[in-house]
């Protein structure tokens, strides 16, 4: 399993950007081009090497994520508990116990724990118990400092579902979503390393990855859409206005 590491003990803007680029480059098929653009496209679903491991090396320990390479869905994470035992927590319908052993060999089968809620944002948000504002991940914010704080909430601690869910919401957005959307990657580097308030555009991007990918795949020529599109933050006519980092795999270009 390919492992990509982000050092958060002494991070820099450049390190974070190249980390996101490495995720993107690991899953892309350089031969695939959609809509006459140069936007990276995920390769066809792999038969081997289905997962990617991401190590988030915080100043006080490492927590790791497991991602599906065919869509960058976060399917599991690995953290030490309060007895210094490696535990792997996973979404059962996204990865099997045997596959989990290949991603996180540090955790024995006895130390694999099923996450009892769904892997979709709404389920994770409910378990994060966000009380302010929209009660969604938007209220948590984003940023390197926040990622470090959220890692500390799950590293070398007894499991607390609220802290786990908050860590997942922040980590998913700063890894997989940043790889899909340069807009998010750029916000993190612009505010580096500080925590910043998320905005509606971030959320609209995150729920529109499929829609945007399909529009570029099926209704775009030389980077220009055949009509105006509105993905929730104003009309766009050119694909480059979307600052996309990675498109969903939709087959060979038509």
Swiss-Prot record:
It is an enzyme of class 3 (hydrolase). Its EC number is 3.2.2.22. SUPFAM superfamilies: Ribosome inactivating proteins (RIP) (SSF56371). GO terms for biological process: defense response; negative regulation of translation. InterPro entries: Ribosome-inact_prot_sf, Ribosome_inactivat_1/2, Ribosome_inactivat_prot, Ribosome_inactivat_prot_CS, Ribosome_inactivat_prot_sub1, Ribosome_inactivat_prot_sub2. It catalyses: Endohydrolysis of the N-glycosidic bond at one specific adenosine on the 28S rRNA. It comes from the Eukaryota. Pfam families: RIP (PF00161). Keywords: Hydrolase, Plant defense, Protein synthesis inhibitor, Toxin. GO terms for molecular function: rRNA N-glycosylase activity; toxin activity. Expressed in seeds; most abundant in the perisperm. Exhibits N-glycosylase activity. Catalyzes the release of one adenine from a ribosome. Acts as a ribosome-inactivating protein and inhibits protein synthesis in a rabbit-reticulocyte lysate system and in various cell lines (in vitro). Induces cell death in Huh-7 liver cells. May contribute to the protection against plant pests and predators or play a role in regulating the death of plant cells. Thermostable at 68.9 degrees Celsius. Belongs to the ribosome-inactivating protein family. Type 1 RIP subfamily. This is rRNA N-glycosylase sapovaccarin-S1. It comes from Gypsophila vaccaria (Cow soapwort). The lineage of its organism: Eukaryota, Viridiplantae, Streptophyta, Embryophyta, Tracheophyta.
């Amino acid at each position: 399993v390919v492992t990509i590491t982000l050092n958060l003990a002494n991070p820099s803007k450049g390190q974070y950007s190249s980390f996101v680029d490495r995720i993107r480059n690991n899953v892309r098929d350089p031969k695939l081009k959609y809509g006459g653009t140069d936007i990276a496209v995920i390769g066809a679903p792999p038969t081997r090497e289905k997962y990617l491991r991401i190590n988030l090396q915080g100043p006080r320990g490492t927590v790791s994520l497991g991602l599906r390479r065919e869509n960058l869905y976060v399917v599991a994470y690995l953290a030490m508990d309060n007895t210094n035992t490696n535990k792997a927590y996973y979404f059962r319908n996204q990865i099997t116990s045997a596959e989990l052993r290949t991603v996180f060999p540090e955790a024995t089968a006895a130390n694999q724990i099923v996450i009892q809620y769904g892997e979709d944002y709404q389920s994770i948000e409910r378990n994060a118990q966000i009380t302010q504002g929209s009660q969604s991940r938007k209220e948590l914010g984003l940023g390197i400092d926040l990622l470090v704080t959220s890692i500390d909430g799950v590293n070398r601690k007894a499991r607390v579902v609220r802290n786990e869910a908050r860590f997942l919401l922040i980590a998913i957005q700063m890894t997989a979503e940043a790889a899909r959307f340069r807009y998010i990657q750029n916000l993190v580097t612009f505010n580096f390393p500080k925590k910043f308030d998320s905005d509606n555009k971030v959320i609209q991007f995150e729920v529109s990855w499929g829609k945007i990918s399909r529009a570029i795949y099926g209704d775009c020529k030389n980077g220009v859409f055949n009509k105006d599109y509105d993905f929730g933050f104003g009309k766009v006519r050119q694909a480059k206005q979307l600052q996309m980092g990675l498109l969903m795999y939709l087959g060979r270009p038509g």
